[in-house]
Amino acid sequence: MSKRETTKYKIDRRMGENIWGRPKSPVNRRDYGPGQHGQRRKGKLSDYGVQLRAKQKLKGFYGDISEKQFRKTYEEAARRRGDTGENLIGLLESRLDAVIYRAKFVPTIFASRQFINHGHVNVNGRRTNIQSYRCKPGDVIEIREKSKQLVLVLESVQLVERDVPEYIEADHNQMKATFTRIPAFADVPYAVQMEPNLVVEFYSR
C-alpha cells in the first residue's frame, strides 16, 4: 500500500467513516475505530467534540490540509458576504487540488496534490504547482501534454465510482477541464455528510 493510501485510510479509520466513498476503505469491513480498544462503545460527544469532529472530517477530505491553512480559509470565508459555511465550501472546492480530483484526472485528493507539486498541471496555459491555487470561474485546467500518459491519470479516468460535478466541465479525451462556477454546498457530491455549519460554530467559540 502506498504512503498516500496509508494516509487516506488512516483518516478514514480516525473518523470511522468512508470519507471518499472508496471501496477499499477499511471502515467498510468494521464499524469501530482503530486500535485494540476500537470495539468499545464510544461515549456521547460534547458540543465541542461534535464541532471538532466536523472540522476534522472536512479538513481531512481535502487532503488533511494544515490547521493554519484551513483556518485561514475559514477566516476568508467569514469576511465575505453571505453565509460563512457556504463561502467555506466554495473556497475549498475552488482549490486547484480539489478541481483536479473532482475532474477525475487522479484517483485521490492526495494524488492530486502530488501531481500538482510535480508540475503536471497547466491553468490557462501556464504551469501551476501550487495546490491551494484558487480557481476562478472560466479557468481552464489541463494535464500537461507529457503527463497525459501517466498510469495514474489513465487509471483514474476509467473509474466509475464517482461522477464529475456539474460545476466542472471535464473532457477526458483532451485531459482538460473548465471550472464553470463556484458551487453551493448542496451542489458538492460528498460521500458522507459534511456539516460546515458546525465548523463555523467551532471557530466562532
Swiss-Prot record:
Cross-referenced Gene3D superfamilies: Ribosomal Protein S4 Delta 41, Chain A, domain 1 (1.10.1050.10), RNA-binding S4 domain (3.10.290.10)
Top-level division of the source organism's lineage: Bacteria
Disulphide bridges: none
UniProt-annotated stretches for the region Disordered: 1-46
Biased amino acid composition, Basic and acidic residues: 1-16
GO function term, MF aspect, one: structural constituent of ribosome
BP terms from Gene Ontology: ribosomal small subunit biogenesis; translation
Protein name: Small ribosomal subunit protein uS4
UniProt xrefs under SMART domains: Ribosomal_S4, S4
Limits of the S4 RNA-binding domain: 94-157
Family, per entry: Belongs to the universal ribosomal protein uS4 family.
Native source organism of the sequence: Bartonella henselae (strain ATCC 49882 / DSM 28221 / CCUG 30454 / Houston 1) (Rochalimaea henselae)
Pfam families xref list: Ribosomal_S4, S4
Keyword set, alphabetical order: Ribonucleoprotein, Ribosomal protein, RNA-binding, rRNA-binding
One cellular component term from this protein's GO annotations in UniProt: small ribosomal subunit
Main function: One of the primary rRNA binding proteins, it binds directly to 16S rRNA where it nucleates assembly of the body of the 30S subunit.
Assembly with partners or alone: Part of the 30S ribosomal subunit. Contacts protein S5. The interaction surface between S4 and S5 is involved in control of translational fidelity.
